[in-house]
Amino acid sequence: MASKPEKRVASSVFITLVPPRRDEAVVEEVRRAACEAWPGRPWESAPTKAPGAGSVGKLRSWMPPGRAAAPGPAVPPQLSNGGCSLPPPPLDVDDALPDLDLLPPPPPPPAADLPPPDEEPHSAMGASLISDLEQLHLPPPPPPPQALVEGPPLQPRPSHLKPAEEELPPPPEEPVSFPEREASTDICAFCHKTVSPRELAVEAMKRQYHAQCFTCRVCRRQLAGQSFYQKDGRPLCEPCYQDTLEKCGKCGEVVREHIIRALGQAFHPSCFTCVTCARRIGDESFALDSQNEVYCLDDFYRKFAPVCSICENPIIPRDGKDAFKIECMGRNFHENCYRCEDCRVLLSVEPTDQGCYPLNNRLFCKPCHVKRSAAGCC
């Protein structure tokens, strides 16, 4: 039965050596030759086979040429394990014996961790060990690893950056993207979809439209590149816009430009005039007769204003002020003409002592009326 695999640790790498199955005589010869070829240890003798020992022995580690074994503590030569009494040297990763039945060793560690090779190899041990391996038809051990050739130290490249700039990390590279279409934030005011810069667009009424969306809202006529009218925020063509316009209350034509609204109708400025003098009323005040004819104020007062019975002038408001018409005994008077005929005091329209006390179709104040009545004459 094979012995338990030995585990050795070198340079922080775990190496597992599996002993091969060989004849006892061949293994013992290899051990004996290795022990005899080891120099500088005269007190150790060749291993002997114990009577009744098993048919499987232990294969000892070996050192390649150019490696010096580390000194170990002295071990008594009286060992009963059937092998050599020489303590095994420390096993290195690069110095493990490659066997036919063993797994290949792992890659060597960096050159900095490897110990420098010895300059004086043990020629006697190497020669005897190679001859024994040739008899067993085994390949010779690999040559010791050579130290890496150190090149010239790297020279730092001259830097033209300032110290503050050298401390800053490089900016991240922006990914290069190739969009299929350019981004746009314009939205069509009709279909509420994005207006791409590659599409024909119309800008009107401070909004963006697709060329096919900018149409008359009544007849759906294309308005791109055409004159249009705006009404209530909607684009209209000229015929549809004229259909929405009001017609003049006098001539019956459509009012396209300036419009005058009066009497619940629309008029052209040239149609809204005085029926007497044909003067344009415009934004001035006007008056109507019983037939709803339009008059300017001057012509209306001349024709329809009452006449004062004292001065015989029409009672017309002046300077934009309202004028009151005073009626008494079927006659009309100006406010300034409504006075007592004897003392010329202004009469009040209220029934007070300052009011009018007529006598024989004449205007008197109360004191004058009493005097005239007492005298019995007018």
Swiss-Prot record:
Species annotation: Bos taurus (Bovine)
Region (Filamin-binding): 1-69
Protein name per the record: Filamin-binding LIM protein 1
Domain LIM zinc-binding stretches: 186-247, 248-305, 306-375
UniProt cross-references to Pfam families, sorted A to Z: LIM
Origin: domain of life: Eukaryota
Region (PLEKHC1-binding) location: 281-378
Localisation per UniProt entry: Cell junction, Focal adhesion; Cytoplasm, Cytoskeleton, Stress fiber
